[in-house]
Structures are given as structure tokens and as C-alpha cells.
């Protein structure tokens, strides 16, 4: 079993039985998970900022860093591996977008990331079936390839599923 570990700005897809797609310490970042239950294809992107126009060079170098590039690329990769081209059957979830800067969330990055992801999913004709967003704590997220279950954990808060 070989898990796929994603860092900030990375996206990936797995069909490996018994494995997980995982990312650590989502603060204001947002993870979008996509799962195709019949084909058992699991994908995730770890988005840091809403729009690539903030830094076009970074967008070219690391497109998953931005919601407007990363979410469509994740979907494209899911389709490449056999998912329906219009997203039919995909189970989409989103997590993160926390306000982690105690008392100083001037830029509202978490909220802006959440809204950007929802807008992009809407443009793709999709929406999340479950969310665990906002609040003021970081999350570690694991998407199980065999089941599509999304486990969330946070130090001091325990573990849960969405």
C-alpha cells in the first residue's frame, strides 16, 4: 500500500487499492476531494490561494496552489483516468478554509478560498456533497481509495468523517 501525500499547491489522483490520498495541516488552505465510487478513483487538491492572477509565474510553476487552476486540473485528471467528462457520479467534498490568524484575519484568505472553490465547482457543474470548512483550526485530511471515506483529524479535537 502506497499513500499519495500532497503538499501545499499539489494535486493528485490514485486508483491504488488499499491506499489513501492525504494532506496535512490545512489552515486557510482548502482541500477539494473527488471520488468516483464505481471506478474507485480518488483525487485531491490542496489549494492555498483563490486566484492565479495574484502571481501568474507561481500559477505556471505550481497550478494546484490556486483554486482557479488547481480544481479544474484535478477534475481533468479524474476524467483522464475514466471519470465522466461532465462529472456525473463524482462525490465532491471540501475542507479547510479556517481563520487561523487569531484576531488578525484581515485578508480573509480562508473565506476567499472557500468561495473561490465553490464558484469553480459551480462552473464545472458540480458542488460539494459535504463540507468541513471555516472555524479556527487546521485539519489533516485523508481520502480512502477503496471507500471514498474522508477522515479529518485535528490535534486536540480528535478525528471525524465527512
Curated annotation (Swiss-Prot):
InterPro entries: CheD-like_sf, Chemorcpt_Glu_NH3ase_CheD, Cytotoxic_necrot_fac-like_cat. It comes from the Bacteria. It catalyses: L-glutaminyl-[protein] + H2O = L-glutamyl-[protein] + NH4(+). Its EC number is 3.5.1.44. GO terms for biological process: chemotaxis. Keywords: Chemotaxis, Hydrolase. It holds the Pfam family CheD. GO terms for molecular function: protein-glutamine glutaminase activity. HAMAP family: CheD. Belongs to the CheD family. Probably deamidates glutamine residues to glutamate on methyl-accepting chemotaxis receptors (MCPs), playing an important role in chemotaxis. This is Probable chemoreceptor glutamine deamidase CheD. The gene is cheD.
Amino acid at each position: 500500500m502506497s499513500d499519495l501525500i500532497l503538499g501545499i499547491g499539489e494535486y493528485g489522483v490514485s486508483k491504488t487499492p488499499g491506499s489513501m490520498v492525504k494532506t496535512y495541516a490545512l489552515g486557510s488552505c482548502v482541500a477539494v476531494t473527488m471520488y468516483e465510487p464505481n471506478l474507485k478513483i480518488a483525487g485531491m487538491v490542496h489549494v492555498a490561494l483563490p486566484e492565479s492572477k495574484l502571481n501568474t509565474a507561481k500559477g505556471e510553476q505550481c497550478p494546484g496552489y490556486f483554486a482557479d487552476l488547481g480544481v479544474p486540473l484535478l477534475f481533468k485528471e479524474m476524467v483522464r483516468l475514466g471519470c465522466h467528462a461532465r462529472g456525473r457520479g463524482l462525490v465532491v467534498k471540501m475542507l479547510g478554509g479556517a481563520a487561523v490568524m487569531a484576531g488578525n484575519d484581515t485578508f480573509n484568505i480562508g473565506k476567499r478560498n472557500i468561495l473561490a472553490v465553490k464558484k469553480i465547482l459551480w462552473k464545472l457543474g458540480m458542488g460539494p456533497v459535504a463540507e468541513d470548512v471555516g472555524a479556527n483550526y487546521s485539519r489533516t485530511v485523508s481520502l480512502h481509495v477503496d471507500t471514498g471515506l474522508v477522515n479529518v483529524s485535528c490535534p486536540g479535537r480528535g478525528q471525524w468523517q465527512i
